[in-house]
From Swiss-Prot:
It comes from Streptococcus pyogenes serotype M4 (strain MGAS10750). GO terms for cellular component: cytoplasm. Pathway: Cell wall biogenesis; lipoteichoic acid biosynthesis. CDD domains: DltA. Keywords: ATP-binding, Cytoplasm, Ligase, Nucleotide-binding. D-alanine binds at D199, V303, K499. This is D-alanine--D-alanyl carrier protein ligase. GO terms for molecular function: ATP binding; D-alanine [D-alanyl carrier protein] ligase activity. Belongs to the ATP-dependent AMP-binding enzyme family. DltA subfamily. InterPro entries: AA_adenyl_dom, AMP-bd_C, AMP-bd_C_sf, AMP-binding_CS, AMP-dep_synth/lig_dom, ANL_N_sf, DltA, DltA-like.
Length: 512
């Protein structure tokens, strides 16, 4: 168990100063360097005389200087707001307007001119590092102080800043490094793929820094080159893979992504979206000896609230994989529309309680009051997810409350339709989306389909292919759930966080 994230890093700077904490295609930085650099940057930040505990926006990619700046800000008592280099200018502006940061640190060239807020460039960070200033930690982030603030996409399009405290982070990190499901080894060798602006990144950097491991990052230029990306990943000595399931699906398009080519890769950690039976089955075929851990949880409950190791028996017997045993310190409940706790096996909304629950959305009391509350004397959060608990306290996922539609008199869960279509042996990936009429009632249901290699060539017309796919799933799919139109694509759009971008597809079919 760790009691302070920075204390842990400082300890490794003493005991394994020359061990790499960061590796980008062979460009390495050690724990000793991280301490020296973060001390110097923290001293520089203190010299700016910012308002105590005010948040600082940090703009960039998955570079070492981003990591060193995060550590420096924690030392100097400031929460950091990570904003990815690929973020749209409109989103960056919205984050600034909501967060009102006292400073912007631009590790990459900043795309906006902001009046009234000082901007520190990479050259100034480099100069601060060269100064090698000593630093005494007298006002570091601790307890209920905000450690980081991650902005999620709000349903209205307005981002919401989730405040995660040092205590929240410790609750998550200690569970992850001690829980048998994750089985995190000492000095873990972690692939650092999800951007820092996505809280799934915490699942790789927190246990790595807590256990003295190495983060294997990828330059932003490489991430944009699909073929080269997965050729390079196959050459990295990573032992643990952390990503969304969608990113693993992309990786499996490369023949190099297999146990024979990547023998060091023994653990897969998934979170951020649903892990399908199809993806898990394919992974077991590619990596027969690997452990697949399925985690679940919203950003508002600090990355994940449950986890479970997926077995081959689960893949054979479940249509939707279980999402885990809840964290011991985070009692998780299923409630009905009236807020009443439901019994085992009954489906309702998943709510999470305990020390990992955020204090709320930054500068947004209205949205905070809607989502955060007290349940059984503990801080609690409405996940907006449908689920149930088995008698063995295993959490089962039933979809999103806001992805439920009413169609032809039936209440339909879009993710359930997608799951059923993904069961077809011809389908590589499928997403169901509604088309609305002028009264915003569902007019019909459509499906975006990516078929497996070689499938299209077996059919003369798409109509015949559609009939074949429908026939392959009709025995386990209710007729009213079957989409009326299938749209075939070579790939489906992904969000910057690597999830299938369902909202973009919904907007596309509705000409928004």
């Amino acid at each position: 168990m760790i009691k302070d994230m920075i204390d842990s890093i400082e300890q490794f700077a003493q005991t394994q100063a020359d061990f790499p904490v960061y590796d980008c295609l062979g460009e390495r930085r050690t724990y000793g360097q991280l301490k020296r650099d973060s001390d110097s940057i923290a001293a520089f930040i203190d010299s700016l005389a910012l308002l105590a505990k005010s948040p600082v926006l940090v703009f960039g990619a998955q570079t070492y200087d981003m990591l060193a700046t995060f550590v420096a800000l924690t030392k100097s008592g400031h929460a950091y707001i990570p904003v990815d280099v690929h973020s749209a200018p409109e989103r960056i502006l919205a984050i600034i307007e909501i967060a009102k940061p006292s400073l912007i640190i631009a590790i990459e060239e900043f795309p906006l001119t902001i009046e009234g807020i000082s901007l520190v460039s990479l050259s100034e960070i480099e100069s601060a590092k060269l100064a090698e200033m000593p630093y005494e930690r007298t006002h570091s982030v601790k307890g209920d102080d905000n450690y980081y603030i991650i902005f999620t996409s709000g349903t209205t399009g307005q981002p919401k800043g989730v405040q995660i405290s040092h205590d929240n982070l410790l609750s998550f990190t200690n569970w992850m490094i001690e829980d048998a499901a994750f089985d995190v080894p000492k000095q873990p060798q972690m692939l650092a793929q999800p951007p820092y602006s996505f809280d799934l990144s915490v699942m790789y950097w927190a246990p790595t820094l807590a256990l003295g491991g190495t983060l294997f990052a990828l330059p932003k230029e490489l991430v944009a080159d699909f073929k080269q990306l997965f050729t390079t990943i196959a050459q990295l000595p990573v032992g643990i893979w952390t990503s969304t399931p969608s990113f693993a699906d992309m990786a499996m398009l490369s023949d190099d992504f297999c146990q024979a080519r990547m023998p060091a890769l023994t653990h897969f950690y998934f979170d951020g979206e649903e892990l399908t039976v199809s993806t898990a089955r394919k992974l077991f075929e590619r990596f027969p000896s690997a452990k697949i851990i399925n985690a679940y949880g919203p950003t508002e409950a600090t990355v994940a609230l449950s986890a479970i190791e997926i077995t081959r028996e689960m893949v054979d017997n479940y249509t939707r994989l279980p999402i885990g045993y809840p964290k011991p310190d985070s009692p998780t409940y299923i409630i009905d529309e009236d807020g009443k706790e439901l019994a085992s096996g009954e489906q309702g909304e998943i709510i999470v309680t305990g020390p990992a629950v955020s204090k709320g959305y930054l500068n947004n009391p209205e949205k905070t009051a809607e989502a955060f509350f007290t349940f059984k004397g503990q801080p609690a959060y409405h996940t907006g997810d449908i689920g149930s608990l088995t008698e063995d306290n295993i959490l089962l996922y039933g979809g999103r409350l806001d992805f439920q539609i009413k169609y032809a008199g039936y209440r339909i869960e879009l993710e359930d339709v997608s799951q059923q279509l993904n069961q077809s042996p011809m389908v590589a990936s499928a997403v169901a989306v509604p088309r609305y009429n002028k009264e915003h009632k569902v007019q019909n249901l459509l499906a975006y389909i990516v078929v497996k290699d070689g499938v299209k060539e077996r059919f003369d017309r798409e109509l015949e292919l559609t009939k074949a796919i429908k026939a392959s799933v009709k025995d386990h799919m209710m007729s009213y759930m079957m989409p009326s139109k299938f749209l075939y694509r070579d790939s489906l759009p992904l969000t910057p966080n690597g999830k299938i971008d369902i909202k973009t597809l919904i907007n596309e079919v509705n000409n928004r």
